[in-house]
Amino acid sequence: IVFNFSGVRNFDYNKLQKDIFSSSYIKDVYRNIVLDDSAISFVVELKENVDYSISEYKEPGYMELKLFNKNEEEPKNVYFIRSKAMENGEPLAMIAEIYFNEDATVVKTKNGLYSVSIGEYSSKEEADKALETLKNREDYNDELYVDSCMSNENPK
């Protein structure tokens, strides 16, 4: 689950991260670098067979994240467009910003680095076609490529 908040210059991410990690449903929580000093973005990775709901309230304003068990699902192979793996920092944030309208997100790789990921496709052909569309953009980053992994795993 990717959370993006704007206008939160004094947001206490460390406290929130600690609170989220207290749940047995959580696999990982990590911050995404955002090129706006009044915004914050972070990812909450859920363990297998966990589902969620998010509710937003006002007066007072807050969000509620509910986590619960869901029916066991068989992991499947998924395809996606991605950048190379790198440290979480400004270069990664710049790639994510370029592809913001394609719902790009930063994901942690198996080796602890990070990658920008775009889309989720059921076949390599479908992902290749989407990558070809991106290649026609003027701002295309030529380091993107199609990759795959099991739906319950992080990419390589």
Regions found by a protein language model. Give the residues of each.
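Extracytoplasmic
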Residues: 88-114, 120-156
